[in-house]
Amino acid sequence: MSQLDSAQLPNEANEVGEDGCYVGLTHDKLDVQRTMDRVRSPEAGAIVVFVGTTRNSFDGKPVKELNYTAYNPMALRTMISICKAMKTKHGLKGIAMVHRLGVVPISEDSIVIAVSSPHRQAAWRAGEEALEECKAKVEVWKREEFEGGEGVWRANRDGAPGQRIDTAEPAVGAGSGGEIDD
């Protein structure tokens, strides 16, 4: 194989798979079926999938799009740690978590989490818990772009306070998945 730089292999450094756990960060559209297939097992009686999409408003303000950014090495470590914990705690056969980065237009997918388990109850619980852990801990931030040009960076979780800014980058020291001060 010829030597290629990392820019020619963008997904190589943006995904990790081990012990029935798969995580990824990508600028491409998410492939829900591919994510489900990563957790499929003949020992599983249930696969639960969560797909988060960009909605068209936040707090009554029309949203144009979301723009996600991440500290990839740390985000991947946190994501795989969450997946391993969920797999052990809930007795899962597999778990996959893929987050989109960059611009995500209205109605497009920003995150896919798939879990497989012998029984549906564990799959439901694990899927929801994995999402909440991801939103609370993973080093991914989003900028909500509103109609009219205003934008707000906020931690990647519901109800997190935002900070109106004029630049296209999050504040330095914004924290590891934590809130950005008003």
From Swiss-Prot:
Pfam families: MoaE. Residues 152-182 are annotated as: Disordered. Substrate binds at H119, R120, K135, K142, R143, E144. InterPro entries: MoaE_sf, MOCS2B_euk, Mopterin_biosynth_MoaE. Transmembrane segments: none annotated. Belongs to the MoaE family. MOCS2B subfamily. Heterotetramer; composed of 2 small (MOCS2A) and 2 large (MOCS2B) subunits. This is Molybdopterin synthase catalytic subunit. It comes from Pyricularia oryzae (strain 70-15 / ATCC MYA-4617 / FGSC 8958) (Rice blast fungus).
